[in-house]
């Protein structure tokens, strides 16, 4: 299968807007290449091992990439994108380029950017094909996300991992909603959870998550379930983690609260700063009291405990 890769070069303040526009027109994935982020991680984690293509940092401007299936509808949706960009980011504020890529190229090209990242005090996420010199006390999670969401390096995932370090109870039950690659489910199991249910509506993500659980030696703890949110999950959990988007989290809050045991905690991430208030209100209305807020850039993660 072939895909149309659309690249928008934009100033930093336009990145989130362009990513939102891509989602609105129905792209099958969004990639953000931000030189500031690239250099930040390259300087923080084994800089000698990083190989950054010059094209990713040449002019210092972020690039946002979206993918549309080459199924005959891409031209119309590309026109929609151009019209919205012209209205919201006029003139030289954005520049658009396109190219056709095969699914095999898309599935493997990202690997050159994926390097080990310390995501918390103890948790380190590394790709299965990379070496990492573990420090004393490190919990190294080996991942191969394939085409599933969740390499472990995005701010929303790192925020979740930091909160998991604090809230996973030894022997407890954890539900990972929208598991993607399974990185959060695997982390919960490695942190001592006794039972983890990893849920995703995408069968590909379920296969990838199961493979990563096996790769990390926690397949006996992690049950992968294909389904929408918690509709196929029974029983209560000590912890529910959902790294999705703000509007879905807000709508999901009552269901999450109903799935928590007394004193249980919901970790919610994937929330842009502007929508954090919306999510907090939804959590409070569902009987959840926010007990911690963590931020990275414009991303927010919340930990909320079920009220007595």
Swiss-Prot record:
| Keywords for the protein's UniProt record, in alphabetical order | Cytoplasm, Methyltransferase, S-adenosyl-L-methionine, Transferase
Give a GO molecular function annotation for the protein: protein-lysine N-methyltransferase activity
A Pfam family this chain is assigned to: PrmA
Q: Which reaction does it catalyse?
A: L-lysyl-[protein] + 3 S-adenosyl-L-methionine = N(6),N(6),N(6)-trimethyl-L-lysyl-[protein] + 3 S-adenosyl-L-homocysteine + 3 H(+)
| Coiled-coil positions | none
- Enzyme Commission number(s) from the entry: 2.1.1.-
Listed Gene3D superfamilies: Vaccinia Virus protein VP39
Please give an example of a GO cellular component term from this record. Answer: cytoplasm
Q: Which GO terms describe its biological process?
A: methylation
The cellular location(s) given in this protein's UniProt record come to: Cytoplasm
- The entry marks the following residues as binding S-adenosyl-L-methionine, namely 157, 178, 200, 243
Q: Which SUPFAM superfamilies match?
A: S-adenosyl-L-methionine-dependent methyltransferases
Q: What does this protein do?
A: Methylates ribosomal protein L11.
**Family, as annotated:** Belongs to the methyltransferase superfamily. PrmA family.
Q: Fetch the NCBIfam families from UniProt.
A: prmA
The protein's name: Ribosomal protein L11 methyltransferase
Q: What is the lineage of its organism?
A: Bacteria, Bacillati, Bacillota, Clostridia, Eubacteriales
